[in-house]
């Protein structure tokens, strides 16, 4: 008996169209790329009945390719069959990333006639991929572009596609290596999309250099993934460049399961589990995704919580499908051993909009994206952060009756303290000199509102309940519907962006006797704001706003030019580089020089990114050099030494004295002290 129910998403199969279908607002849509995924799963199963259905599904998907040669997107695909047009330009990548590897792996399971159709479709699709030529900032799509081009070229025996893909791969690696991590930082969804795409290339490419570059990018992404996983919540700590609402509010499977799947499928190495489980109980991680735009992400792990803050939102694409999805501030926390973790996160909202008021298109639900309407600048260090918002599109075009930053507790809270007083009733209004402490799960979250620009007669700060959430609202405006000439850019009245924001600090409940006790500690600190007097913008002048919090011997600060809403500087008491490629107690990365951590050192004389993971308690060290030029390579650890005369790109793993060396351009015999080589290439 052939049980189609064992195939993922089989319950969505519509035999009348041979595609997967979903109902949205009582209208049925047939999903093109998900149907392609369904076909792959059928082919992998391999029984005659499954293969027969797979052929029907593939043919149905191919009918959703744009075949009008006059169309500028000839060769692309519809996102849904019902659209009948190409709008989402990513559709071609999402279909090809399924059909190309499937055909390379399982050509013996696919009829000759269908293979011919697939190859014909792939050829015109790859021409469309080249015309679209996605930019290097779009991480998951550029990864699919590269994989589809190289493997599609192999499938078609067409070197021009391979050459284009290889060039783009090298350009992408160089782009990443100027910063630290890929531009789409720390996404609970698109991390895996990128890893899955690159894993096809690692497995199926005929070129060792291609394989090595793809593997280095994939593993570096895996390191970032692992460093942001919290061992107790089992979730991917913030900040997130893009997080759909079910992922943001922890309604999906834990990301620890996702990492395990990648490891179990041999896409990522097993030692990443050690990186998650065997590390300091309290740990700060900082990475940079864009040095030029000063985008860094900071995450602090404590026993019961993680705090994640981005220096700015992902704002490099003006696209309703992609933009305004960043999760720039969040605290994830445990709520006892058996409960789903809780979360508090932030949004800037206009006209009292909420979840359900925005959808990308009719065929996608209105509960996927909690639309972010603010621009954000922030800095984090340990359990503390300064978080600054400005409305993104408030000006003299659209009318508005409310504009506010909101801190949203998605899970039940236990207690609220204001200036040490336990609050029992909501709503309640506060002022910006109040100290607010919220007890939720196993943590306390303290908030100090910053000074706010009042665009009307009143700009209240209040704590309210909204749809089972508790929300701290920080208003810039509440009043009659109007435009704001003073915010129009360009404009004759513009004097800079509005001020709005908060200082946040998180603590373990077990460290304090009450919320009042924690509030007293936070109050001991000094919150300092300095801002320039109003001045009309002349195209060159600046108007600075600096915010700093000091307590004991610790300092955290950020300064912005409010005319451009750009970061001038960020600082802490002990960090000289606020835009490191990677800085943590167990992993670090640099563009040049020696890399040192935990009594271990990596020395590479050549130019190029190098990184080191050090887990001495697990007798595990991993080091890499990204190239692209040749370099010597010396890894010195407490248990021994690896010395390589020359390599172009390399990954060296030392686990319990067993050494694996994967490299291109390897010259000379590696010299080993204290260990044994078990694998070379």
Where are these regions (language model features)?
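Aromatic-lined, polymer-binding surfaces characteristic
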Residues: 26-205
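Carbohydrate-active enzyme catalytic cores, enriched for enzymes
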Residues: 205-314
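A broadly conserved detector of short glycine/acidic/proline-rich loop/turn motifs that flank catalytic sites
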Residues: 72, 306, 311-313, 392, ...
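Extended repeat-based interaction scaffolds and adjacent low-complexity, acidic/S/T/P-biased segments
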Residues: 356-681
